[in-house]
Amino acid sequence: GLAVGHHGLMGKQNLYDHSVRVPLMVAGPGVPKGQKIDTPVYLQDIMATALELAGLEKPDHVEFHSLMPLVRGENVRPYDAIYGGYLDAQRSVTMDGYKLILYPSIAKVLLYRLTDDPEEMNDLAGKPESLPIIKRLFARLLKLQVETGDELDLKSVYASLL
């Protein structure tokens, strides 16, 4: 998606939900109609989902998950956190109803409680009570960096969050 003026931005170069969270529709045999699921997933999950819908086995090198358990209404969360990045300019993690966005070149931290603020308009990062949440999300973000092979150094920029 495009920002089209949201947050004062015009393009796609951001990690706000209006730009990175796009609608996905699944249709086919065995797929219930009229269902809406809000669980965050990765675009790469589509391959595993398509393979399952086609009755084919997922190759071992495919790291992502089929969305069919979600589609069938099973109570699963394929990921405990969703990782995002844009070049070396931004990183994000969405977890437990929060989103942490980092701009390492300017050492900026943004925190949103998505359950209360789905439009990401009320930055909570400056509130003292948010620091434990920021640290928890930052720790998970660092683990996701390792898992994905992301070598951007966030530890030196955000040493106070360690």
Regions found by a protein language model. Give the residues of each.
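C-terminal cap/loop subdomain of S1 sulfatases and analogous C-terminal strand-loop tails that border
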Residues: 1-6, 44-47, 52-114, 119, ...
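Histidine-centered active-site microenvironments of extracellular/periplasmic hydrolases
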Residues: 1-32, 42, 91
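Active-site rim elements
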Residues: 11, 30-40, 53-58, 121-130
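Generic secondary-structure boundary signal with a strong preference for alpha-helix termini
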Residues: 11-13, 23, 108-109, 129, ...
